[in-house]
């Protein structure tokens, strides 16, 4: 009944919002005509109806293409902005009741130098960005100047699709099934594309008007040309599109896709863990388990008319997703991990707000199962966007979906959002309502936000206010920013954040901390016109001030940065920064007890960095960064990193990144200890806040290899070797005796290498401090899209960790099988095959 009550509240909220006529909602918005070319004239193109669809083979030889009017008025966007393109491009558009057909002739004076790139479908960075010849076409089918659908094909025939959101960015996680083929001859290369109307969203009418833009990239010249001319610095994406007309009597398209999957494989784990971390370090519990798994589920996508979509998933599997990077976090602040699961990424940009009220990684945590999830999303003719996402999870993951559904450890999640376009579509207001529940614990969050885009997108006012309710405890949060960009030589911004003591959206959202007031201001100057030495240059200065609600300064930071892009496309950047003396009210957080100690004083620290990056369009790319910092009390840190990317063939890419971080801390936080004091036959406990001098080191080595076997087959390999070391000075333990001060040396000594009832294990031996930690992650995925939308996966993953033992080489690490005191290790591995098959009805 509680679930039903939550949904009833949501429906009431939706109804009130939709019928708020005094705000102008529920009325058709009249979107303005676009003026996108150099002289503010309207760019206009026409699609022609055809009785016979063209054969999609990449060869535009059929007479049906003669019906269409060719579009060829492209101009350079880069490197020579607003000048004529160096190669000719012609585009033709046809349509029938089922699909839109695009024919493209990409003429080239040197066809043998056209750059091809085989890569996994939808991987923009591996198959498109700066490394191959490609063509894109964008459609604002809703004609709201805020959203769009993007379709891209490169010179190897690899596809990529995305959506435009908020007129500011792209969502590359949107995936659709459409057909394209390419061909090459002595005149250049050619594309034919078939885009079903069912995968786009529009309002049916006798004569539709869409927004449209097109782009081409010629790799050997590093030349980017577009249909819509954009002077450098002009902001906006969909709001800059030209008009596409000519559609007549296109029926509303409905989409039904059913994607069941079956998965089979095994997991194994071996190793040994310390039975008692505070023991003599020689008592272990063995790890030795093999699990075999056969599972299945289904995804369903249903298009309601041409404006709304329902996505449902039952028992989804994301085992082929790349593992999160290794990290050790013993602080108060939760580690933030990016979302990689397609169900939660696709059409999720509507939930992007100044305060992260929806953090989808909350759903389906480790050792839990997502039993089912669904979302409804769309946009109405009157400019109202909406999305509702719900999920039901089990806190335990057994071998059976049905048994997990019946257990008592169930949790539900509900996120909902409404966004109404205002001011002729350049701005919007929004509402958000979230709810979670588990084990008698419930939360409810509500938020309202607004984005105003004024003066041709030069002035942006973006703000949000949020209220949280956790079992009756109410919290308030606010985030706002004013930004101005004059599109030529400077931009500036001012932002403010406020979160009271009770604000807590972390059941479904993400907020690092409450009890905070944050101010930030910045100014950037830039040079965008190419000169004799560089193509682009910028310099910026930023200032940030943070305090808690008691007025204690917890952050006071200023930085300045500088960057240059040379005419050969090499880049350099540098910066200096200063963190003024302030306090940390969360440093003395005990990871085991979750208790907080007094505030700690932090010294003034100065830092600097320098980085260099080679031309990213070349087969060999390199980059390096060096950074150093030092405090007035002798703390120091340094970081060196190098990046190498190689593309030895048109189908293989490999990259390696190495980072070495070293630092020295005068006082490295350890823990809160307890001392029992006998006072007149009555024991009392005194708390001690312990620190140590520490030499720290962290090394990270990652290696990636991707190989495109065909446009529908790929192999991807990823590995990460992670090492973290803390060398504590056991003669230099310190204690924080008073708040807002530095820790000092005292006679109190709670540690011993032979602990007993009156002492604790030395921190460098205690494995809960991860003073000697190493891990290796390996991930290998083979993908084969054997039919449009249907995919076969072969997935191998392994992870080994060692805690408490230093390894000199990777070989020593990999061959280690335990046996040392105060040291533990585990090796986990899995091998799976997964098959999904797409059933589709027009």
Task: Label every PLM stretch briefly.
Residues 1-7:
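N-terminal secretory signal peptides that target proteins for export/translocation
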Residues 9-22:
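Bacterial N-terminal signal peptides
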Residues 27-420, 430:
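Structural preference for beta-rich elements and adjacent junctions enriched in aromatics
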Residues 112-119, 161-163, 202-204, 321-323, ...:
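A short, polar/proline- and glycine-enriched secondary-structure boundary/capping micro-motif
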Residues 231-252, 394-456, 570-619:
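Outer-membrane beta-barrel transmembrane domain signature of Gram-negative proteins
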Residues 251-311, 413-469, 529-543, 606-630, ...:
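Surface-exposed extracellular loop regions of Gram-negative outer-membrane beta-barrel proteins
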Residues 287-291, 309, 318-544, 549-560, ...:
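Catalytic-domain carbohydrate-binding cleft regions of carbohydrate-active enzymes
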Residues 369-371, 377, 456, 460-842:
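Exposed, low-structure sequence patches enriched in small/polar residues
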């Amino acid at each position: 009944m509680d679930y039903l009550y939550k949904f009833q509240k949501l429906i009431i909220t939706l109804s009130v919002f939709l019928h708020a006529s005094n705000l102008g909602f529920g009325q058709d918005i009249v979107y303005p005509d676009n003026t996108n070319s150099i002289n503010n004239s309207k760019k206009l193109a026409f699609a022609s109806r055809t009785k016979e669809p063209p054969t999609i083979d990449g060869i535009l030889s059929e007479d049906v293409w003669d019906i269409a009017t060719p579009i060829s008025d492209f101009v350079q966007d880069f490197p020579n902005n607003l000048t004529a393109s160096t190669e000719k491009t012609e585009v033709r558009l046809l349509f029938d009741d089922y699909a839109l057909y695009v024919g493209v002739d990409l003429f080239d004076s040197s066809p043998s130098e056209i750059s091809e790139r085989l890569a996994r479908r939808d991987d923009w960075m591996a198959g498109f960005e700066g490394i191959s010849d490609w063509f894109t076409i964008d459609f604002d089918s809703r004609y709201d100047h805020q959203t769009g659908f993007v379709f891209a094909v490169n010179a190897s025939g690899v596809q990529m699709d995305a959506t435009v959101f908020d007129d500011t960015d792209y969502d590359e996680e949107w995936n659709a099934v459409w057909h394209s083929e390419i061909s090459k001859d002595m005149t250049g290369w050619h594309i034919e594309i078939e885009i079903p109307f069912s995968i786009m969203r529009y309002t049916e009418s006798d004569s539709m008007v869409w927004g449209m833009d097109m782009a081409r990239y010629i790799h050997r010249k590093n030349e980017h040309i577009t249909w819509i001319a954009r002077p450098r610095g002009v902001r906006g994406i969909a709001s800059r599109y030209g008009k596409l007309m000519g559609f007549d009597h296109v029926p509303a398209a409905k989409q039904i896709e059913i994607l069941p999957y079956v998965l089979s494989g095994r997991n194994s784990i071996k190793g040994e863990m310390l039975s008692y971390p505070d023991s003599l370090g020689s008592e272990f519990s063995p790890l030795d388990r093999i699990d075999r798994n056969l599972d299945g589920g289904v995804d369903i996508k249903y298009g309601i008319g041409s404006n709304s979509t329902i996505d449902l998933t039952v028992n989804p599997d994301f085992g082929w997703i790349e593992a999160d990077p290794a990290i050790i976090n013993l602080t108060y602040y939760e580690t933030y991990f990016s979302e990689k699961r397609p169900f939660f990424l696709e059409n999720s940009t509507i939930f992007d707000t100044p305060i992260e009220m929806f953090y989808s990684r909350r759903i389906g945590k480790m050792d839990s199962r997502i039993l089912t999830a669904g979302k409804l999303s769309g946009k109405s003719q009157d400019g109202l966007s909406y999305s509702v996402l719900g999920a039901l999870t089990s806190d335990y993951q057994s071998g059976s979906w049905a048994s997990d559904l019946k257990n008592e450890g169930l949790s539900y999640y509900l996120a909902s959002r409404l966004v109404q376009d205002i001011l002729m579509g350049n701005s919007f207001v929004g509402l958000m309502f979230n709810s979670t529940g588990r084990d008698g614990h419930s939360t409810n969050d509500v938020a309202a936000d607004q984005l105003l885009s004024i003066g041709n997108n030069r002035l942006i006012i973006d703000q949000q206010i949020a209220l949280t309710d956790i079992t009756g405890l109410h919290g308030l949060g606010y985030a706002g920013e004013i930004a101005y960009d004059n599109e030529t030589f400077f931009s500036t911004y001012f932002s403010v954040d406020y979160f009271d003591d009770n604000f807590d959206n972390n059941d479904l959202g993400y907020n690092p901390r409450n009890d905070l007031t944050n101010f930030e201001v910045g100014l950037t100057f830039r040079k965008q016109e190419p000169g004799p030495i560089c193509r682009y240059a910028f310099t910026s200065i930023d200032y940030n001030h943070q305090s808690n609600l008691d007025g204690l300064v917890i952050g006071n930071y200023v930085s300045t940065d500088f960057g240059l892009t040379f005419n050969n496309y090499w880049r350099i950047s540098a910066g200096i920064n200063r963190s003024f003396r302030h306090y940390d009210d969360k440093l003395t957080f005990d990871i085991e007890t979750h208790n907080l100690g007094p505030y700690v004083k932090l010294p003034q620290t100065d830092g600097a960095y320098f980085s260099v990056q080679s031309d990213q369009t070349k087969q060999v790319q390199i980059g390096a960064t060096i950074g150093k910092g030092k405090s007035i009390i002798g703390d120091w840190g340094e970081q060196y990193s190098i990046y190498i990317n190689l593309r030895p063939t048109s189908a293989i890419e490999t990259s390696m990144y190495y980072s070495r971080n070293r630092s020295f801390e005068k006082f490295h936080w350890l823990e809160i200890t307890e001392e029992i004091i006998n006072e007149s036959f009555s024991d009392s406990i005194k708390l001690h806040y312990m620190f140590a001098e520490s030499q720290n080191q962290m090394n990270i080595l990652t290696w990636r290899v991707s190989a495109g076997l065909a446009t529908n087959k790929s192999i991807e390999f990823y590995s990460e070797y992670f090492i973290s070391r803390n060398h504590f000075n056991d003669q230099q333990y310190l204690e924080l005796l008073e708040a807002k001060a530095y820790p000092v040396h005292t006679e109190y000594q709670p540690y011993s290498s032979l602990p007993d009832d009156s002492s604790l294990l030395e921190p460098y031996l205690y494995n809960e401090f991860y003073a000697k930690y190493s891990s290796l992650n390996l991930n290998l995925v083979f993908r084969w899209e054997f039919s449009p939308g249907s995919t076969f996966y072969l997935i191998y993953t392994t992870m080994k960790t060692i805690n408490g033992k230093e390894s000199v080489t990777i070989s020593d690490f990999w061959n280690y099988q335990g046996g040392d005191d105060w040291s533990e290790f585990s090796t986990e591995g899995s091998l799976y095959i997964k098959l999904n098959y797409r059933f589709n009805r027009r």
